[in-house]
Amino acid sequence: VGQCGDGLQVLRAVRQSRPDVVVLDITMPGLNGLDICRDLSRKCKFASVLILSMHDNEQFIARALEHGASGYLLKGAAAAQLTEAVAAVARGDLYLGPGISRSVLERLSNGEEDPYDRLTSRERQVLQLIAEGRTNRAIADELGLAVKTVDTHRMRLMRKLNIHDQTTLVKFALKKGLVSLQ
């Protein structure tokens, strides 16, 4: 059992401790839970992911499942439900908490493409840090990159998303749940 303060710590901790189940929130600093989930499903197949989130929104739920989550439970669920969810995910079962709608599964089956999915992992990291209000210099320092490289990632992700200004970029990140207003 472990606890991490941000998304980058989660990736390091999972690689070191090799847990069977990782319980993640979607809204996390540094790297959001959806991107962590995607990375874990590709690089740490030994760990199943259960998303425990306040986001009761079919878009978030569908994206979590698309990114490799094995379960999704809303915060505020009873302790027994959390125990049941962890056990189900540990067995390799899919777990969706009560009230998670059929429309989520329908959305998954119709294959809608999300422009966010076209971004590289690094572009997603840069987008999240921009949305958190970091400057190019601060992003460069945090990710160990040159400022010019951060600027290049910013330009590429804006082009891929067809976004032309900072305000719209931050709105996009909020809508995707990369950051919250709290």
Please place each PLM-identified region on the residue numbering.
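Acidic catalytic/metal-coordinating carboxylates
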Residues: 6-9, 32-35
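Active-site residues of response regulator receiver
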Residues: 25, 53
